[in-house]
Amino acid sequence: MATLTPRQQQIFDLIRNTIRNTGFPPTRAEIAAEFGFSSPNAAEEHLRALARKGVIELTPGASRGIRLKVARSDSEMPDQFSLPVSGIMQLTLPLVGRVAAGSPILAAEHIDRQYQVDASVFDERPDYLLRVRGLSMRDAGILDGDLLAVRKASEAPNGKIVVARLGDDVTVKRLQRRDGAIELIAENPDFPNIMVTPGREEFSLEGIAVGLIRSSGF
């Protein structure tokens, strides 16, 4: 296992804990703010050093494109991983493919298959996996083909990444409530945000993202 400097270990721990608590890695700016760096570029240099030591993987062009490659103790599993994964505590989760208009997201016809995943990688137990389509959440480290682990919920706090139903479509976005309206925020400047007026549009929350499984390996 690579030997990390004390600062590198602190940054690795921040990445791991942020993924564990929110389901997603921190941005360079968030790392810089946490450690008092003068700019995100300083955080980037530390991340590159961690990548060279083989403990993380960086996704070019994504502000949250950080993936843990190793655990730092025998009792830990990586917070983001590729299937299949062996473990003592296993969850069997349905993988939701395309969702037909007007039908429940977990309707039998939407289930592509069942996956077994290690329960220890999630602080909150997910109810299902949703295959991500497109790159609208790229800068949150969520890429086309990834599997998003989702806990069923009809309400969510501001700032959470959610699965939302808007009319006939199901989308993954960051939730923000403003002045009686709801904004579904894309994490990619190439995609527009979506404004929703409750009561005027068919809108519902289907769940909150609690983790991510990379598409590589299956």
From Swiss-Prot:
Reactions this protein catalyses: Hydrolysis of Ala-|-Gly bond in repressor LexA
- Molecular function terms in GO for this entry? DNA binding; serine-type endopeptidase activity
Q: Name one Pfam family in it.
A: Peptidase_S24
Concerning SUPFAM superfamilies, the annotation shows: LexA/Signal peptidase, Winged helix' DNA-binding domain
Site location (Cleavage) = 101-102
Q: Which InterPro entries match?
A: LexA, LexA-like, LexA/Signal_pep-like_sf, LexA_DNA-bd_dom, LexA_repressor, Peptidase_S24_LexA, Peptidase_S24_S26A/B/C, WH-like_DNA-bd_sf
Report the EC code(s) recorded for this entry: 3.4.21.88
Record-annotated DNA-binding residue ranges: 28-48
HAMAP family given in the database record: LexA
The annotated subunit structure for this chain is:
Homodimer.
Q: What does this protein do?
A: Represses a number of genes involved in the response to DNA damage (SOS response), including recA and lexA. In the presence of single-stranded DNA, RecA interacts with LexA causing an autocatalytic cleavage which disrupts the DNA-binding part of LexA, leading to derepression of the SOS regulon and eventually DNA repair.
Q: Which family does it belong to?
A: Belongs to the peptidase S24 family.
For this entry, the protein name equals LexA repressor
Organism in which the protein naturally occurs: Cupriavidus pinatubonensis (strain JMP 134 / LMG 1197) (Cupriavidus necator (strain JMP 134))
Annotated gene: lexA
